C-alpha cells in the first residue's frame, strides 16, 4: 500500500484551474528611484493631488488586469524593501477545468514570453 501523494495522482480525474506566477525585480540603480519612476512616467497625478492622501506615502504602483488567453494580472510597483528596484509580478490564471497535463507547458511558456516580451516592452516605453 502506498502512503505518499504520487500514488494518488492516477486517481485525479480533473483539475479545476491552472496558474503561472512570475516575479522579477528591475533595478533602477538609484536610491528611492522606483517610486519616482512610476509616478512621473506612468501616472498623471500631480504632487498636490498626492498630498490629499496625507503623509507617509512610500510609493505608488500599477495593477493591470487583461482578459486574454487566461486572465493576466500584472503588478508593477516599488519593491518596498529596496526602493531602488521595481517589483514586477505577472499572474496568469486559466480558470477552466481540464484533465491531463498536455498543454500546461505551452501555457507556462506563454506566460514567460509575455513577461519578457510585452511587459518588458511596456516598461521600456516608460523611460
What is each of the regions a protein language model found here?
Residues 1-22:
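Aromatic- and glycine-enriched beta-alpha-beta binding-site module
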Residues 7-11, 44-48, 122, 126:
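Short secondary-structure junctions and interdomain/linker hinges
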Residues 18-85:
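Aromatic/basic-lined ligand-recognition segments
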Residues 55-58, 123-127:
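Low-complexity, flexible helical/coil segments
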Residues 67-126:
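Mixed-charge, glycine-accented linear interaction segment located at domain edges/termini
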Amino acid at each position: 500500500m502506498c502512503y505518499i501523494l504520487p500514488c494518488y495522482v492516477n486517481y485525479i480525474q480533473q483539475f479545476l484551474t491552472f496558474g503561472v506566477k512570475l516575479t522579477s525585480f528591475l533595478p533602477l540603480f538609484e536610491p528611492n528611484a522606483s517610486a519616482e519612476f512610476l509616478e512621473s512616467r506612468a501616472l498623471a497625478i500631480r504632487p498636490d493631488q498626492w498630498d490629499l492622501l496625507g503623509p507617509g506615502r512610500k510609493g505608488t504602483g500599477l495593477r493591470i488586469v487583461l482578459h486574454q488567453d487566461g486572465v493576466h494580472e500584472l503588478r508593477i510597483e516599488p519593491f518596498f524593501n529596496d526602493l531602488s528596484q521595481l517589483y514586477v509580478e505577472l499572474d496568469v490564471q486559466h480558470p477552466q477545468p481540464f484533465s491531463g497535463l498536455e498543454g500546461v507547458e505551452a501555457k507556462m511558456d506563454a506566460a514567460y514570453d509575455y513577461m519578457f516580451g510585452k511587459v518588458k516592452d511596456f516598461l521600456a516605453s516608460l523611460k
